[in-house]
Amino acid sequence: QAKHKIEKMILFQRPGHEVKLNAPKEVNWEEVVSAAKEIDCVEMNSNEFAYILYTSGTTGTPKGIVRDIGGHIVALKWTMKNIYNIDEGDIWWSASDIGWIVGHSYIVYAPLFKGCTTVLFEGKPVGTPDAGAFWKIISDYKVKSLFTAPTAFRAIKKEDPEGKFFSKYDLSKFESLFLAGERADPDTIKWAENLLKVPVIDHWWQTETSWAISSNCTGIEMTKTKYGSACKA
């Protein structure tokens, strides 16, 4: 049981689902934002801490991973061009959760370090409102590359195996799909390749590394890959 006790909680009130706040511990998001003041940037040493993020604990007790500032920035910016082939001004979408390492690295830090647009999406690949949700986002925002989990594409494949929703949208700006977070089964990869007609890349990394340590690099040179493996055959 944690000995540290939370002093304040900031709650975002969703329309139609408002809750009564327990003041003074619970405060309204809108009130906090409206009262916010601009804070100047603070100069830090490159070896100081950026954040602590805990691992999932799948194989044991969760471990607090400490990330430094300088090396983290250099590595993430390098990956955006060399692994994902993303340049300044491109539209990038990492369909993950900011609380996970993918969200930390590739919703927030990496795209902003690189100077590209990062898409934030709240919803599911199906049911919000249908199996065309991802295609609509890619089409509306002219997304160049998407990073998501294989489960998302398995869900889309199950709901729309023939890709009927896909045909409703213009994905002419879309160049690549990256999968990670779990095993990407060959059937799902092949289905996505046949539908999207772009490279579908299964790559591997973990919270401890903060970026991919096994991947095809679309910004350097694509190598032949065996289905079910992350990168080189």
Where are these regions (language model features)?
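Short beta-strand->loop structural element characteristic of the AMP-binding/adenylate-forming
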Residues: 1, 64-66, 117-126, 201
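Conserved pre-ATP/AMP-binding loop-to-beta segment of ANL
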Residues: 9-11, 17, 22-54, 61, ...
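Short Gly/Pro-enriched turn/cap motifs at secondary-structure boundaries
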Residues: 41-44, 226-232
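Conserved S/T- and glycine-rich ATP-binding loop of Class I adenylate-forming
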Residues: 49, 55-58, 80, 92, ...
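Conserved AMP-binding/adenylation subdomain of ANL enzymes
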Residues: 73-91, 101-145, 158-164
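Residue(s) in the substrate-gating loop at a strand-loop-helix junction
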Residues: 97
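Gly/Ser/Thr-rich phosphate-binding loop
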Residues: 116, 144-148, 157-225
